[in-house]
Amino acid sequence: MSFVIAVPEALTMAASDLANIGSTINAANAAAALPTTGVVAAAADEVSAALAALFGSYAQSYHAFGAQLSAFHAQFVQSLTNGARSYVVAEATSAAPLQDLLGVVNAPAQALLGRPLIGNGANGADGTGAPGGPGGLLLGNGGNGGSGAPGQPGGAGGDAGLIGNGGTGGKGGDGLVGSGAAGGVGGRGGWLLGNGGTGGAGGAAGATLVGGTGGVGGATGLIGSGGFGGAGGAAAGVGTTGGVGGSGGVGGVFGNGGFGGAGGLGAAGGVGGTASYFGTGGGGGVGGDGAPGGDGGAGPLLIGNGGVGGLGGAGAAGGNGGAGGMLLGDGGAGGQGGPAVAGVLGGMPGAGGNGGNANWFGSGGAGGQGGTGLAGTNGVNPGSIANPNTGANGTDNSGNGNQTGGNGGPGPAGGVGEAGGVGGQGGLGESLDGNDGTGGKGGAGGTAGTDGGAGGAGGAGGIGETDGSAGGVATGGEGGDGATGGVDGGVGGAGGKGGQGHNTGVGDAFGGDGGIGGDGNGALGAAGGNGGTGGAGGNGGRGGMLIGNGGAGGAGGTGGTGGGGAAGFAGGVGGAGGEGLTDGAGTAEGGTGGLGGLGGVGGTGGMGGSGGVGGNGGAAGSLIGLGGGGGAGGVGGTGGIGGIGGAGGNGGAGGAGTTTGGGATIGGGGGTGGVGGAGGTGGTGGAGGTTGGSGGAGGLIGWAGAAGGTGAGGTGGQGGLGGQGGNGGNGGTGATGGQGGDFALGGNGGAGGAGGSPGGSSGIQGNMGPPGTQGADG
């Protein structure tokens, strides 16, 4: 016997669509009627006239048939529309009597037993912790439990009757000051068919205590799976712990155990539910950060496998696999260990869970893989402390004859982490009787301190001044050169500005050249931290006591990735050229801008971490079976990426040529930009895990498992990008811009990691870093 359903809304929509299609076809037929029925003869002869009449008769026959088809289509659409209306009326007419009939059937059972024959149980009110109502005795799901008031447990889910699912447990109340309350237990599934209800989530922790435990999943009857355990309550913040995940419910005679609930922060995952007679144990819940995963549920009394262990939280072990069925079944696999996370359990990864044991007949479960090692920290360049001290200024010299100002003194050296001091300014050179006046050279920047000190900036050049009456020339002093960055890395110092050349009479004036920018020092740029070692793999489970193979040991965890190298330090900016200034008819020429400093080399990437130790294989059954193979050592971590090379310093701007007396002016040339620094070398890939697990012992008939191999070496880190070349300095008025900085070299790829001995393969060499960007012309 087949069953047919009708949805009035769908029928109405279909009728509307068919009506639209019919309208479109009728419009097309009407448009084609005249051209097809009134075919004009091709010529005046009898044959052409006969052909035109023949084709015209075909068209007339088609349009006559089309008219009949259109009438049938309209009748069909009308019938479909009427049918939809009839279904709507029938539903409305029959709903009330059926509901009344169901009420008559349920009333005696409700009065006598407190539950209906057919129907779902009522949900418990939230905030009261009231349990969910039971489902109908014959058919119906249990109601959901109500959530608990603050600090009070959630209500239990209602039980199903013969057929139906248990209700979900209510959420536990949050703790105001104390602990969160437990979630409600899931309702029991149907006696014949149905799944157990999910346990309620635990309440969140109060200010100082722990979160509530998740509710246990509901059990079930003949056919069906146990309910999932509820999640543990959340932690309230620093110093508090979340709740443990609820255990999974027990499976039916034919059914699986429920999965355990996830643990809150710092709390274990729930244990998987046990299978009854035929089925698989439930999987363990995921552990919260710093806590292990839940163990898998045990297999049934007769035939079935154990549940898998839950994943470990950050830094914690995976759950152990559940034991196989008492008569026949394999042990469950161990859960994977949690990855290492900084600040959680010392930054160590979790070990893989052990595989579950078989009982009489069956193979042991495989051990879980170890967690991934902690990633290395990225290199960080030290900062530079400002230095308030400066070099001594040069002596001012003024008098008859050629006069030259004294040179500025060098800037004082910086202390640890301190920048070098600024060089002293050059002294004034002033000729009072029209001879040459030359400014003193600015002092060199002070030596940078170790551990990140920046190079000191060069001092400004002194002013050169004369009235030119004796044919003298005014020349500004050169700016001092910037100092190189510190030995342990530092930014190069800026070059000093060239001094002004000022001729108040008829002679020429030349601005001083800017100082050269100091080189950035990145040779000892900060290296990335080394990655951590991967976690150990879990041991394989024991094979069945009579017949069965041992479980394979879990692989060691992958080593952590090395940290990236820090960027190289930038080169110093070249000093600006000095101004040439005349008040008469002489030529005024600005000074040339200083060269930009070289960029520093990028830091080396950190070495990848070593792979973890493989787990041991499980022993075989006592009579017949093979021992489990040992787990392989973990794969080495990838080396860190090399740091980007430091940018070259920009060239200094050319000085301006300025006159107030009508003389010629020439702008100074802009300085050449500095070369960008080479990219850092990529980190070496981590060594593969050198220790594979031991093979398990064989049975009376069988042999031992093979020892685990060593892990592959990690991939070498990628070389850093070359630094960008410095921009050429802007030329002074009327001068050509400075030349752009050269391309920088890309960093070398990192060496591949050494494989474990023996059997580990070496890591792949890192890629060459691309060249830096050429600096723009001024």
From Swiss-Prot:
Tree of life domain: Bacteria
InterPro entries: PE-PGRS_N (IPR000084), PGRS_rpt (IPR048996)
Region feature (Disordered): 125-163, 372-510, 718-778
Domain PE: 1-92
Biased composition (Gly residues): 402-429, 436-510, 718-763
Family from the record: Belongs to the mycobacterial PE family. PGRS subfamily.
UniProt name for this protein: Uncharacterized PE-PGRS family protein PE_PGRS46
